[in-house]
Amino acid sequence: MTTIVSVRRHGKVVMGGDGQVSLGNTVMKGNAKKVRRLYHGQVLAGFAGATADAFTLFERFEGQLEKHQGHLVRAAVELAKEWRTDRSLSRLEAMLAVANKDASLIITGNGDVVEPEHGLIAMGSGGGYAQAAASALLKKTDLSAREIVETALGIAGDICVFTNHNQTIEEQDLAE
């Protein structure tokens, strides 16, 4: 699995993920890039789950973004519908976190499109650890969104055996 964290704070949205790819109990790769920019750099997207499945979902989601002129919520809802009803897609085992200047969303294969509270997304095998860390930092510090994402991923990497410390982090100004 993996850990993906996204935080909205102080006029920025930041998304980060670790780089570990595991097959069973073996680490196959340590520098995978699980967070990227989509739709002309306007959307941040990260995945947790099977890598090949995630790439399929990235392609489908980017197609929905193009179809709906970059409208994040509409594209997410349409992908979730397609994912739930298309026989080949329904077998995919991954989750997507997506964010732009307007919203942060989690998209699942069950057809769920969830906008989490407080602008915080944490998912994957280390998601619980990262969420606890990021929540505490959001409540008790004035750290930047990037610092919170970096710290939360680091804590998840210390605890979760399926998460490493090789971080990919993308950030976007909310004014863009």
From Swiss-Prot:
Coiled-coil region: none
Cellular localisation: Cytoplasm
UniProt GO molecular function: metal ion binding; threonine-type endopeptidase activity
One Pfam family named in its UniProt record: Proteasome
Catalytic residues in the record: T2
Catalysed reactions, semicolon-separated: ATP-dependent cleavage of peptide bonds with broad specificity
Example GO BP: proteolysis involved in protein catabolic process
Annotated keywords: Allosteric enzyme, Cytoplasm, Hydrolase, Metal-binding, Protease, Sodium, Threonine protease
Domain of life: Bacteria
InterPro entries the UniProt entry points to: ATP-dep_Prtase_HsIV_su, Ntn_hydrolases_N, Proteasome_sua/b, Proteasome_suB-type
EC numbers for this chain: 3.4.25.2
Chain residues that bind Na(+): G157, C160, T163
One CC-aspect GO term: proteasome core complex
Regulation acting on activity, per entry: Allosterically activated by HslU binding.
UniProt xrefs under HAMAP family: HslV (MF_00248)
UniProt family annotation: Belongs to the peptidase T1B family. HslV subfamily.
PANTHER family in UniProt: ATP-DEPENDENT PROTEASE SUBUNIT HSLV (PTHR32194:SF0), METALLOPROTEASE TLDD (PTHR32194)
Subunit structure: A double ring-shaped homohexamer of HslV is capped on each side by a ring-shaped HslU homohexamer. The assembly of the HslU/HslV complex is dependent on binding of ATP.
Function: Protease subunit of a proteasome-like degradation complex believed to be a general protein degrading machinery.
Protein name, per record: ATP-dependent protease subunit HslV
Originating organism: Pseudomonas fluorescens (strain SBW25)
Lineage: Bacteria, Pseudomonadati, Pseudomonadota, Gammaproteobacteria, Pseudomonadales
Gene name of this polypeptide: hslV
